[in-house]
Amino acid sequence: NPNTLFHVDAVQGYGKAKILPKRMKIDMLSVSGHKIHGPKGIGVLYVRKGVPLFNLIEGGAQERGRRAGTENVPGIVGFGVAADLSMKNMEANQKKETELRDYLIGQIEANFPNSKLNGSRSNRLPNNVNFSFPFIEGESLLIMLDMKGICASSGSACTSGSLDPSHVLLAIGLRHEMAHGSLRLTLSHENTKEEMDTVVRELKVIVDRLQAMSPLY
């Protein structure tokens, strides 16, 4: 259908990889400020010229009449600064994050021989690590990591309220028990190798404990 619109959710990728909307023939693209160390509650919607877009909120002429209401000026300015810094430092940040990512992947594989790295080892965002651990629940894993001060996820923010295993992991062939025990760690160029060691150390204690409790392990 030639009238189909192509929308890209670039929240995770913006600032981590080059995104060229015109060259990629993207119609609409979403970006969020907090993913690039900007303020929370601010984002950007890129809309290709000529794409019809209906008003979200009627009233004033703010945002070219698309969404009435006073703009979040501090958030907009903060996002602009964060975006500028992200673009200027992208290459250096990619290098640092890739080194941390590969180090963390290596440490997890060394300490958890029955774990599985989800996705390609190299063809992935420089700051993304996603593993599955058999016969444990992702929710329990996240709660226990949180108690140790480690922020993690078992899937996308879109499915954060669901206890079901990731439909994406199931679609790429993971067994139910592996998809249910998935863990996503998103890194920053501000992280350190020492923090990666802390994650692995705490993860080892938690995974061993949860697997020992599992009747299936």
Give the label of every model feature segment.
Residues 1-217:
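Pyridoxal 5′-phosphate
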